Amino acid sequence: MIRPNMFALLMLVVLAITSVNADCPKVKRDVCVIGGGAAGMSIATLLKDRGYDPVVLERESVVGGHCNTQYFDPPEGETVDWIDYGVQLFMNTTQLNLTGVGSWSLATDKFAERFIGPNATLPLEGNDINLYVNMETGELVIPNVNETALNNALGVYFYLLSMYPWTSDGKYTGTIPPELLQSFGDFASPFGLNAMAEIFRAFGYNSGIAYGNYTNLPALYMLNAASMSVMQVLLGPSTTTFKVKGGCYSVYRGMSDYLGSENIVLNATVTELTRSFFLSTKSPRLRGYTTRADGSTDNFEYECEKVVVAHPPTLDDLSYVDLTQNEQDLFSNVEVAYYYAGVADISSSYLNGNSFQVMNADPSSEYNVPFGPGLISLGRYVDYGPTQIQAISNTNLEVCDMLEIITRDFENIPSWILNSFDIKTFDQHKEYAPHFNLASLSNPVSPYAKLAELQGSNNTYWVSALNRYTAATAHVWDEANIIVNTYFPSKN
């Protein structure tokens, strides 16, 4: 027999559950997209194109992921009022397809202009001033570039790339060739590629994935980071790479307008994703909460026909998912790089009125780059306004610790180059450049093949910079387009 006080307690529990459900009504969606970066926003727009009604859940207060843009008041008569300090350049896949460099399903130039407007793509321009400084000693470093050796090295390197043509677009799920599992420093040494130090610097060190003598990453990843398609930035016509008018964020602002604010949930923390297994017909359930400016929270719950996980799938970031054993085994092999970026105001009688890049250099390194952690570079593409700053670490440092290191680096830049500086914003790019570790790459069945096999299992799809071998936006957008075209039949 239930005692009266026990019955009252049960009623309180029922009322509590009912009140929670009343405050948090379940919303049904055909697709729930977790993550509002390049992968999540692009796949959501492509899904809407095909008649779907996606919702995007983003943990930050803005969408765009690694696409960071700061706006400022330009001098009178000038029109550029932005500086990108995350993603700055886009590969033009229309031009790459025309020249036979890779096979791309989505035209990045048309895709960007769709959300910004016509004539929104801008050609890449060089800097007025490029300097190399050892930011530990303050010494000015003059790169030793031998044109003959460089041309010979380029010929050898292009031949090497021709042996792995899939590096141009990263669409490869076969067994990784064993020679590409060497560190890039060891792989490159017999071929005399040191003459390409400045080129590898651009795609290795400057991009935040490699440092020192490039022994920290397999050759596989450097060949993809400096693939024939990416190399067009330096060697191809100006039309093969572009910037965008209004800065990188303008692309994602346009995507947000297309999707509608009611379909984008910002400051969203997903706490639980429960999916259907085996013969169950239940749809995935997704729960979490949003955080307001005052710190208060609101719960949400979605019933989703399909779920797209559109952020790098590290185990730490998948704690909310009821992972299968296969998923857990695969994603336990995912690693990330430690990259930081921000914006600073500077004063410099030497640099004022110029576009420039001041790069950290270490002449004791074979590739003239430091071993980290520290500042990579500071620079801007126009001759006025604030400066973007980049930094790299070989360990996962807290932002405050990294800020202390780069402040020291700034202070070591000679005063004739830099008079003063004021760092305005600085943060870590979390889950940057996700990649599979060396042990998993050594298996006969590539982890990229295993990732491809997971698509659609348990009504879940995975798209992020992990799907290809490099984290360029063109690769992410292209992968999103392929997944939508392959697994989501048009509802129109």
From Swiss-Prot:
<feature type="glycosylation site" description="N-linked (GlcNAc...) asparagine; by host">
    <location>
        <position position="119"/>
    </location>
</feature>
<feature type="glycosylation site" description="N-linked (GlcNAc...) asparagine; by host">
    <location>
        <position position="146"/>
    </location>
</feature>
<feature type="glycosylation site" description="N-linked (GlcNAc...) asparagine; by host">
    <location>
        <position position="267"/>
    </location>
</feature>
<keyword id="KW-0325">Glycoprotein</keyword>
<feature type="glycosylation site" description="N-linked (GlcNAc...) asparagine; by host">
    <location>
        <position position="97"/>
    </location>
</feature>
<dbReference type="GO" id="GO:0005576">
    <property type="term" value="C:extracellular region"/>
</dbReference>
<feature type="glycosylation site" description="N-linked (GlcNAc...) asparagine; by host">
    <location>
        <position position="458"/>
    </location>
</feature>
<dbReference type="Pfam" id="PF13450">
    <property type="entry name" value="NAD_binding_8"/>
</dbReference>
<dbReference type="GO" id="GO:0016491">
    <property type="term" value="F:oxidoreductase activity"/>
</dbReference>
<keyword id="KW-0964">Secreted</keyword>
<dbReference type="InterPro" id="IPR050703">
    <property type="entry name" value="Flavin_MAO"/>
</dbReference>
<keyword id="KW-0732">Signal</keyword>
<feature type="signal peptide">
    <location>
        <begin position="1"/>
        <end position="22"/>
    </location>
</feature>
<dbReference type="InterPro" id="IPR036188">
    <property type="entry name" value="FAD/NAD-bd_sf"/>
</dbReference>
<protein>
    <recommendedName>
        <fullName>Uncharacterized protein R656</fullName>
    </recommendedName>
</protein>
<feature type="glycosylation site" description="N-linked (GlcNAc...) asparagine; by host">
    <location>
        <position position="213"/>
    </location>
</feature>
<feature type="glycosylation site" description="N-linked (GlcNAc...) asparagine; by host">
    <location>
        <position position="92"/>
    </location>
</feature>
